[in-house]
């Protein structure tokens, strides 16, 4: 029943495309629209990183362009990463999923040993003046692993408990290391992405319900038995109860939205970014954007993000339709990652969700996040280029 609902939803999205795309110019393919949205978001993000970070950079580094320069380097690096990822054939990714998973585990272990601790979390590895965040790499690698797994073990996934047990074991090892950092936000994204692919691959409703229930219980346990997480989870319901304590970030973010109204105060005229709103150029970039460009600016960014997401889903649906199962599930996994990051980041900025350290794709400052987002878009473009025609071969197990 649940798998049928998922397929019905995807079919509705595809029908929407088939109904409206013929009315648009031939150049407006899902691929071209996707690239257009990403470029627009990158441009908006670059402008907002400059606007939001300059006061903080001047205070911390005595150079207002400190984060602007680093962001420009990150964009250049992300472009190189995207090019290299695009050049790798899809079958190379899928034939080496276990090796990529082991590399991911080693990175997650390394960050616990040699990682840099910031605000009580050990999530970053310093490399030549820059930082690498292994959890961002884990999101992409686990999407590739899960997409391959549900095809390689298709019979087990759909008919036997072994499919659930094997995948749960891999999930437990991976998210266990991420929780140890700790990084609950990345944990939620990875777990829900894996559960989503498992569901779309046709898992029995009972297994899906058990897996989802275990995830919800696990997240609840992590929140309830860690005082700072519980305080953060509860503060979003009424940040004004403790505006100088647990509700400080959110109360300042809400004031930023309030000042922005419909059209904003103008580029560079944000008050909250002047040391009032912590992480203004990273997690709370949307609040600064709302203050400077108002509801209209927020609507444009969210609209572009969801159009980008719809293009990813469209490309994934066509891949499945043409019998490229691994590619299709990977596209859906990437779509789920983007969807969760957009919803959680926007939700926490607007006080609809607890505060979590998740960036807004292509908008927020963050080198590893930007590189991995570029890599995911590159994978989507590779899927689009590789699945234009119906797959003449039935996809088989890798081993």
UniProtKB/Swiss-Prot annotation:
It is found in: Cell inner membrane. Residues 54-72, 119-126, 181-183, 229-292, 349-359 are periplasmic. GO terms for molecular function: lipid-linked peptidoglycan transporter activity; peptidoglycan glycosyltransferase activity. It is an enzyme of class 2 (transferase). Residues 1-32, 94-97, 148-159, 205-207, 314-327, 381-399 are cytoplasmic. Its EC number is 2.4.99.28. Signal peptide: none annotated. GO terms for biological process: cell wall organization; FtsZ-dependent cytokinesis; peptidoglycan biosynthetic process; regulation of cell shape. Pathway: Cell wall biogenesis; peptidoglycan biosynthesis. It catalyses: [GlcNAc-(1->4)-Mur2Ac(oyl-L-Ala-gamma-D-Glu-L-Lys-D-Ala-D-Ala)](n)-di-trans,octa-cis-undecaprenyl diphosphate + beta-D-GlcNAc-(1->4)-Mur2Ac(oyl-L-Ala-gamma-D-Glu-L-Lys-D-Ala-D-Ala)-di-trans,octa-cis-undecaprenyl diphosphate = [GlcNAc-(1->4)-Mur2Ac(oyl-L-Ala-gamma-D-Glu-L-Lys-D-Ala-D-Ala)](n+1)-di-trans,octa-cis-undecaprenyl diphosphate + di-trans,octa-cis-undecaprenyl diphosphate + H(+). Its main location: membrane. Keywords: Cell cycle, Cell division, Cell inner membrane, Cell membrane, Cell shape, Cell wall biogenesis/degradation, Glycosyltransferase, Membrane, Peptidoglycan synthesis, Transferase, Transmembrane, Transmembrane helix. The chain crosses the membrane at residues 33-53, 73-93, 98-118, 127-147, 160-180, 184-204, 208-228, 293-313, 328-348, 360-380. GO terms for cellular component: cell division site; plasma membrane. It is a multi-pass membrane protein. Pfam families: FTSW_RODA_SPOVE (PF01098). InterPro entries: Cell_cycle_FtsW-rel_CS (IPR018365), FtsW (IPR013437), FtsW/RodA (IPR001182). PANTHER family: CELL CYCLE PROTEIN, PEPTIDOGLYCAN GLYCOSYLTRANSFERASE FTSW-RELATED. NCBIfam families: ftsW (TIGR02614). Belongs to the SEDS family. FtsW subfamily. Peptidoglycan polymerase that is essential for cell division. This is Probable peptidoglycan glycosyltransferase FtsW. It comes from Acinetobacter baylyi (strain ATCC 33305 / BD413 / ADP1). The lineage of its organism: Bacteria, Pseudomonadati, Pseudomonadota, Gammaproteobacteria, Moraxellales.
